[in-house]
Structures are given as structure tokens and as C-alpha cells.
Amino acid sequence: MNNLDISFNDEVNFLKDSDKDWITWISNLLLSAKKEIHKENTQEMSINFVSSKKIHEINKKYRGKDRPTDVISFAIEDGLDEDFISAFSDDPDFVEDIGDLFLCPEVIKRHSVEYETGFNREFGYTLVHGYLHLNGYDHIEDDEAKVMFGIQGKVLREYGLPLHPDQENHGKQIH
């Protein structure tokens, strides 16, 4: 079983403002990431598309950063006992609520221009990055960053989304 149940909340009409089938695109990309990190059980999560103003407020309130950002992850497992979670993680019938992503398409678009990556690539990068955070990956320490950005890079390449040249060396983060 390799299911990923995603609830979408679109406050900025991102999903409707395009001819692209973003829901399928997002689901397939995240299923690729899920497979790469060897999650066998069903996962559920929410993806919230919000304005620059809204993500700025969230970033300030929960992260103490007074600026808009591209993605904020609220992982359910943060603070939960690791042994408790691991006892169920290999059970294919266990449905794991991994948390909520808040994405700001406006900031992602700005980053795609700034980093010259193109919107689809930048959106995919941001989406996989947030998903990995929901699954306990981090990039505070160098060894953690190497693992996280390595997975992120592999998933993006396999999905046909090119890495920024600065990321080719061990999946280094450019922003």
C-alpha cells in the first residue's frame, strides 16, 4: 500500500488559476518522495495555499521571522515519542497523519525568478522540501542537510525537475 491522502485548502485560487492539473502533479510528486523515504503505510496531510500576507503572519507567529516565506511545515510528530511512532510506522494498515503544509505560490514564483529555476521546478523543490520536514527530515546540521537535500534532489531529478547548478554538489540548498 502506497497511499497518500491529501486535503487541499486553496485560499488564493492557485489550483483554479491554471490549466495544469496541479492536484495530480502534486500527488504524483509526493508519492515519488514517499517511495524514496520508504514509507509503506498510508499517510494523510493537508496542503494549504495562502497569500504572502497570511504566510508572513504564520512565519512571524510560529517561527519568529518577520517576513513571508515559501513554505511552512507543521509536523504532527514533532514532540511525540519516537518509539511510539516507530511501533506503527511499518504497519501497512496504519494511517499516519503527518501534518500540514502552508505554501505561498506568490513567494515561490518570486523565488523561481530570483534563482532562475522556473516555476514548476521551484514549486516541486518547495513541495518536496516541506513534505520531508513533515516526515522528520531536517537540515540544521550538515549531516542532516546532506541526507535531506540528497533525497530532495533525487526525487526532483527522477520527476524531471532540474536541480539548480549549486545543488548538484550533495543537494546543497540555494535558499
Swiss-Prot record:
Q: Which Gene3D superfamilies match?
A: Metalloproteases ('zincins'), catalytic domain
Q: Report the InterPro entries cross-referenced here.
A: MetalPrtase_cat_dom_sf_prd, YbeY, YbeY_CS
- Where, per UniProt, does this protein localize? Cytoplasm
State the UniProt keywords alphabetically: Cytoplasm, Endonuclease, Hydrolase, Metal-binding, Nuclease, Ribosome biogenesis, rRNA processing, Zinc
At the top of the EC hierarchy, this enzyme's class is hydrolase
Q: What's its EC?
A: 3.1.-.-
Q: What is its main location?
A: cytoplasm
Any one of the GO BP annotations: rRNA processing
Record GO cellular component, one term: cytoplasm
Q: Report residues binding Zn(2+).
A: 129, 133, 139
Molecular function terms, GO-annotated:
metalloendopeptidase activity; RNA endonuclease activity; zinc ion binding
What cofactors does this protein use? Zn(2+)
Q: How is the cofactor bound?
A: Binds 1 zinc ion.
- What family does the entry list? Belongs to the endoribonuclease YbeY family.
Q: What PANTHER family does its record include?
A: ENDORIBONUCLEASE YBEY, CHLOROPLASTIC
| Function as written in the Swiss-Prot or TrEMBL entry | Single strand-specific metallo-endoribonuclease involved in late-stage 70S ribosome quality control and in maturation of the 3' terminus of the 16S rRNA.
Q: What is this protein called?
A: Endoribonuclease YbeY
Species the sequence originates in: Lactobacillus johnsonii (strain CNCM I-12250 / La1 / NCC 533)
